[in-house]
């Protein structure tokens, strides 16, 4: 999909459809008022007659209005003007693109982004509009013999911005929105693939291809390399599967050679049956999404590379399956991690932290400025926070705040959970340095406490995306989160330099 910024008045737009808004008081927006004048009061009469009362997310499609060059006019209800905030704006934009899909319109003039959204500016409106436009066109039907349903026809979106003083900020927002949307698509495509296709070896192949596309440095550790290094925790998870584990590293060098990199470490369990601690059968198919952290690293690096950010970023992806089998790790087994710490594996379904602890220890050799791990780590985080926000914890408060702010900026929000020393008590083992699980209480926190034991040598934060990486039910599929948060985090860091 192509995007462009238009600075002329809406009545001059000649495309297939033009979109303007109406508030619940039956008040036309400024763009709608200008169109109404060109159409000799036609829009005003429609509104006065009650065909469009302005209730949020109601739509009315009009055709062939005399005096208006566009073939169609889509009126979209904005709700009460005094309540027009972030969520309402985002819902309205989603509704707009959904309403456009069956029209056959190929190019659209959108005059919603100059509306006043509480606490936001026009650039934010544009960035979100671009992301939502691309999201509305997303389809994942590559595994079907025949694509179902009508394919999206919309090819171009012209975003109306009459205030030319915002032109530079708006153009930047447009490019950032496109890069984020492209990164989210990469993340969703990887997540939505069937687990018999998206294996650790497949991810390694995709990483190598991505490295060629964006001139990244690619390397991969095979199981024999991990054995030589002493990655006993990662290998313990892989033992039940015939698919070999991998540890993938992608390096983006956009900053100075002297600048330390930001490291993103993404959990890549391409299918998690739980191992010997077998999961219930219900919804086990969704455990293909347990590589959402890894997928988000792919997506974020895509966005960073497209934007050519002046920053150094390293993506570290430990990837394996977690399956039962005759050679699988058993509850009670004790393994030695890369850090030298021994771990009593009380539950083989607490596997994400096992592969991450070795990946985090491995990341030390890159002397990172900061490290952020991203993982669909715990059901406990979903219980605590639902599917609205991700959980964030860490050993460095400024870093945690950077991530929280990036989430607020992009509306890909996170919530700060505590990491108090008292929680560490739950991880005591009678037979090893640490156990891989605690009690049933505070599970998202104790999982992060476990990881914190392998992050003593760098500034670190942990994003638990178990509730935000995918949707269940009728709209089942990967969400592309937290690519917006991570990309904004890196944009902000690059801007500081």
Curated annotation (Swiss-Prot):
GO cellular component, one term: cytoplasm
Record: residues binding Mn(2+) 1: 272, 349, 351
Active site (UniProt): 279, 353
Source organism of this protein record: Nitrosomonas europaea (strain ATCC 19718 / CIP 103999 / KCTC 2705 / NBRC 14298)
UniProt GO molecular function: manganese ion binding; metalloaminopeptidase activity
Protein name (database record): Probable cytosol aminopeptidase
Catalytic reaction annotation: Release of an N-terminal amino acid, Xaa-|-Yaa-, in which Xaa is preferably Leu, but may be other amino acids including Pro although not Arg or Lys, and Yaa may be Pro. Amino acid amides and methyl esters are also readily hydrolyzed, but rates on arylamides are exceedingly low; Release of an N-terminal amino acid, preferentially leucine, but not glutamic or aspartic acids
Keywords: Aminopeptidase, Cytoplasm, Hydrolase, Manganese, Metal-binding, Protease
Record's function text: Presumably involved in the processing and regular turnover of intracellular proteins. Catalyzes the removal of unsubstituted N-terminal amino acids from various peptides.
Cofactor binding note: Binds 2 manganese ions per subunit.
Keyword Metal-binding on entry: yes
Location in the cell: Cytoplasm
Binding residues for Mn(2+) 2: 267, 272, 290, 351
Cysteine-cysteine disulfides: none
Alphabetical GO biological process terms: proteolysis
Pfam families attached to this UniProt entry: Peptidase_M17, Peptidase_M17_N
Known EC number: 3.4.11.1, 3.4.11.10
HAMAP family (UniProt xref): Cytosol_peptidase_M17
Family: Belongs to the peptidase M17 family.
Entry superkingdom: Bacteria
Names of required cofactors: Mn(2+)
Chaperone found in the keyword field: no
Gene3D superfamilies attached to this UniProt entry: Leucine Aminopeptidase, subunit E, domain 1, Zn peptidases
